[in-house]
UniProtKB/Swiss-Prot annotation:
PANTHER family: BIFUNCTIONAL UDP-N-ACETYLGLUCOSAMINE 2-EPIMERASE_N-ACETYLMANNOSAMINE KINASE (PTHR18964:SF149), ROK (REPRESSOR, ORF, KINASE) FAMILY (PTHR18964)
Gene: xylR
Keyword hit for S-adenosyl-L-methionine: no
Recorded GO MF terms: DNA binding
Family from the record: Belongs to the ROK (NagC/XylR) family.
Keyword line: Carbohydrate metabolism, DNA-binding, Repressor, Transcription, Transcription regulation, Xylose metabolism
Record-given protein name: Xylose repressor
Organism this protein belongs to: Caldicellulosiruptor bescii (strain ATCC BAA-1888 / DSM 6725 / KCTC 15123 / Z-1320) (Anaerocellum thermophilum)
């Protein structure tokens, strides 16, 4: 793709995103917002209308002269499937073209599930979604999948996903051959960051870090409204930064990784450590410690469990140290805590904010915002919807 064609595709996506963000808008207003001349905006919107992605929707008010024609994204042009392929779950949604959910399912699975069994579950969920898809002009536009690991985006290959025990899995090819639909693969934290930018409350924030906290830990980094990928496309693996030189071996094979101290798995590990040390209460004991779940820990903490409160505070402190390092390096306007940690509660968030502000060298000099994702555990799946739209329009062979 030549530079001129690439620039045109980027501008086209920018125009579409602007229409999506504003719900209904005139060409003149788009031109002002995206800093493109009126003729360019007119040509790009005409293409989007011709392709069916945008529709004209009546007239706006005029201060004199002709009333402007208003534009709106055609939400019913096609459906999109978004998938968060977690370590112990698969979360799938079918949405229309503006991210409104048509069908949603969440399936649990055991950690370290056999790859073939996992793929069968994935196929079953995709087939369910396909059957639920309404009749639209373009049908199902594509499938976006977020995976916790190192992804070669161009080929859609999972190079390494330690918590899934996957290596060199050509996931895009596998799913594409099965369903004969365009498939787009990315790291799930990157997808979460895209979800926040496209569909979240803080979409207009130009520099942010989305922290995806589940069994593992990853970061999607947005700099100047663009996803920061690094030289090879692998940026954001904050869970595998070293904060301890004498810890147990991580799933990646290294020692002292942050996700060993700051994740769902870490929360469960701290609970067991505290009980072993003799710190018990009426909620947690040796008899039930192996059955405790993260959601039960959060609930018990709210009800006054000493063990659960201590565990949440310890994990928040370790995570705060890791995030403070990211803040020092990237100087974001906002840090968004997402995925499973979006349910960790106020006790966790207050401690996290306290530690980040104490530990970050630069946080004291500006108004850093640290918030829990309002999209909760939907940020990744919605980011996968955004991934399909943006990749589809940036690479015309999938349009």
């Amino acid at each position: 793709m030549g530079n001129h064609t690439l620039l045109k595709q980027i501008n086209k996506l920018l125009v579409l995103k602007t229409i999506l963000d504003n719900k209904i808008i005139s060409r003149t207003k788009i031109s002002k917002l995206v800093d493109l001349n009126k003729a360019t905006v007119s040509n790009l919107t005409d293409e989007l209308i011709k392709e069916g992605y945008v529709v004209e929707k009546g007239y706006g008010k005029s201060k004199g002269g002709r009333r402007p024609v208003l534009l709106q994204v055609n939400k019913d042009v096609g459906s999109i499937i978004g998938i968060d392929l977690g370590v112990d779950y698969i979360h799938i949604i079918l949405s229309n073209f503006v991210g409104e959910v048509i069908f949603e399912e969440y399936a649990n699975m055991k950690i370290g599930e056999d790859k073939e069994k996992l793929l069968r579950l994935l196929f079953d969920l995709i087939e369910k979604s396909v059957k639920k898809a309404p009749q639209t002009p373009k049908g199902i536009l594509g499938i976006g999948i977020g995976v916790p690991g190192i992804i070669e985006k161009e080929s859609g290959t999972v190079l390494l996903a330690p918590n899934l025990k996957w290596q060199n899995v050509p996931l895009r090819s596998i799913v594409q051959q099965k369903f004969n639909l365009p498939v787009y693969i990315d790291n799930e934290a990157n997808a979460g960051a895209l979800g926040e930018k496209w569909f979240g409350e803080w979409g207009k924030v130009s520099d942010l870090i989305y922290l995806s906290v589940g069994i593992g830990l990853g970061a999607g980094i947005i700099i100047d409204n663009k996803l920061f990928r690094g030289a090879a496309g692998f940026a954001g693996e904050v869970g595998h930064t070293t904060i301890n030189f004498q810890d147990d071996v991580c799933s990646c094979g290294n020692i002292g990784c942050l996700e060993n101290f700051a994740s769902e798995r870490a929360l469960l590990s701290v609970i067991k450590k505290l009980v072993k040390q003799g710190v018990e209460d009426r909620y947690i004991s040796w008899e039930n410690v192996d059955e405790i779940t993260p959601s039960r820990i959060i609930q018990a903490a709210k009800e006054g469990s000493r063990v659960c409160r201590m565990a949440i505070l310890e994990v928040a402190e370790k995570m705060g140290i890791g995030v403070a390092n990211l803040v020092n390096i990237f100087n974001p306007e906002m840090v968004i805590i997402g995925n499973k940690a979006s349910f960790f509660g106020e006790l966790f968030l207050e401690k996290l904010r306290e530690v980040i502000n104490q530990r970050s060298f630069i946080a004291q000099f500006y108004n850093l915002k640290i918030e829990v994702s309002k999209l909760k555990d939907r940020a990744v799946v919605l980011g996968c919807i955004a991934m399909v739209i943006s990749d589809m329009l940036s690479f015309p062979e999938y349009a």
